[in-house]
């Protein structure tokens, strides 16, 4: 079982006299920066010129170029998207990594897959809230917090874990609980969850269900409601109380159908495919493919993305959502991983 730390387990004094630079001011960046500041930490922001720079300035932060912020800071938290981090690091952060500084991540991808290789004289650790930035911020203001993961990759000062815990506490996470992990575990399980269950698995299941009903002659609007729209109702129940609470809350007919049909959908072959997906992640095959795809300017990614936008499920969904003004689509990118970024 994971080791869990709470407020009373943390020595926040290790942050005294230190300046934290938050690189990025998106979903996670604004939450980390504001929570740290309100916890008494000296925070600056590192950005490129643009809307985020203006927003951070409006919020009362001192904003600098990434390189200047990295030079001024003792602790540098990188909250830009995974695919942008290596270039930002190489150009603007690495030259300013003097001995004793700390490099921090909210997702382990670039460290675990060697896209960023820090010098030996700096601490490297993970501080990853398990929720989107707006929730990290809101729960903090309410006196609560979102659980977070910490992991130490490199301990040059002998204080990396203490600093990681203090950072997590000052963004509110130790109010809920901070779980200790490793960069390997966080990275591989995060990618697997996204691919096999949360994004890849769920998207494929929803599309297959929709297509099955439409091909059998049912109206696409009805198929959309049954296979996509109502998914939120079930996921919310799982979120609140696990599978047991979901099953308690649905009808007995639905629960019996769950027991009878579920194993016919997710079969031994499905689990074998999941193991292959996990193996590809563990061996670095997925990472290599994604890195290459980005270097080539994402030809396959963009082609698939455009095709998916025109799937009949999406076409009918856009029409039906016009009937439901209470359904609002957030335009924030990276809500799941980079809940996380």
UniProtKB/Swiss-Prot annotation:
Taxonomic superkingdom: Bacteria
Reaction catalysis annotation: (2R)-2,3-dihydroxy-3-methylbutanoate + NADP(+) = (2S)-2-acetolactate + NADPH + H(+); (2R,3R)-2,3-dihydroxy-3-methylpentanoate + NADP(+) = (S)-2-ethyl-2-hydroxy-3-oxobutanoate + NADPH + H(+)
Coiled-coil region(s): none
Keywords: Amino-acid biosynthesis, Branched-chain amino acid biosynthesis, Magnesium, Metal-binding, NADP, Oxidoreductase
Residues involved in Mg(2+) 2 binding: 190, 226, 230
Cofactor field: Mg(2+)
Underlying gene: ilvC
Protein name, per record: Ketol-acid reductoisomerase (NADP(+))
Disulfide bonds: none
Keyword Coiled coil in annotation: no
Species of provenance: Shouchella clausii (strain KSM-K16)
GO CC annotations, alphabetized: cytosol
Gene Ontology terms, MF aspect: ketol-acid reductoisomerase activity; magnesium ion binding; NADP binding
Binding site for NADP(+): 25-28, 48, 52, 82-85, 133
Co-factor binding comment: Binds 2 magnesium ions per subunit.
Alphabetized InterPro entries for the sequence: 6-PGluconate_DH-like_C_sf, KARI, KARI_C, KARI_N, KARI_prok, NAD(P)-bd_dom_sf
UniProt similarity note: Belongs to the ketol-acid reductoisomerase family.
Residue positions binding Mg(2+) 1: 190, 194
Residues forming the catalytic site: 107
All residue ranges annotated as the KARI C-terminal knotted domain in the record: 182-327
Signal sequence, renumbered to the chain: none
Residues at which substrate binds: 251
């Amino acid at each position: 079982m994971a080791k869990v730390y709470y407020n009373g387990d943390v020595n926040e004094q290790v942050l005294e006299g230190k300046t934290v630079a938050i690189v990025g001011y998106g979903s996670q960046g604004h939450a980390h920066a504001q929570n740290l500041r309100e916890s008494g930490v000296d925070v600056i922001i590192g950005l490129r010129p643009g809307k985020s720079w203006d927003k951070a300035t409006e919020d009362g932060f001192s904003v600098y170029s990434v390189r200047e912020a990295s030079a001024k800071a003792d602790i540098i938290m990188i909250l830009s998207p995974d695919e942008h981090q290596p270039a930002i690091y190489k150009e603007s952060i690495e030259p300013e990594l003097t001995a004793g500084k700390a490099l921090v991540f909210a997702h382990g991808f670039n460290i675990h897959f060697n896209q960023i290789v820090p010098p030996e004289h700096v601490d490297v650790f993970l501080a990853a809230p398990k929720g989107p930035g707006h929730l990290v911020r809101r729960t903090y203001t309410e006196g609560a917090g979102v659980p977070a993961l910490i992991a130490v990759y490199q301990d040059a000062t002998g204080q990396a874990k203490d600093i990681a815990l203090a950072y997590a506490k000052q963004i509110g996470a130790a109010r809920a609980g901070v779980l200790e992990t490793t960069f390997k575990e966080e990275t591989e399980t995060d990618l697997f969850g996204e691919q096999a269950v949360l994004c890849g698995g769920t998207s494929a299941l929803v599309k297959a269900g929709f297509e099955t009903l439409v091909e059998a002659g049912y109206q696409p609007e009805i198929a959309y409601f049954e296979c996509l729209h109502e998914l939120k109702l079930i996921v919310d129940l799982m979120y609140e109380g696990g599978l047991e609470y979901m099953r308690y809350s649905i009808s007995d007919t639905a629960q019996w159908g769950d027991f009878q049909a579920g194993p016919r959908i997710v079969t031994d072959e499905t689990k074998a495919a999941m193991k292959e997906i996990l193996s590809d992640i563990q061996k670095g095959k997925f990472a290599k493919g994604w890195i290459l795809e980005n270097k080539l300017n994402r030809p396959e990614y963009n082609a698939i993305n455009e095709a998916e936008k025109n799937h009949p499920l999406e076409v009918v969904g856009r029409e039906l959502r016009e009937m439901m003004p209470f359904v609002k689509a957030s335009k924030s990118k990276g809500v799941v991983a980079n809940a996380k970024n």
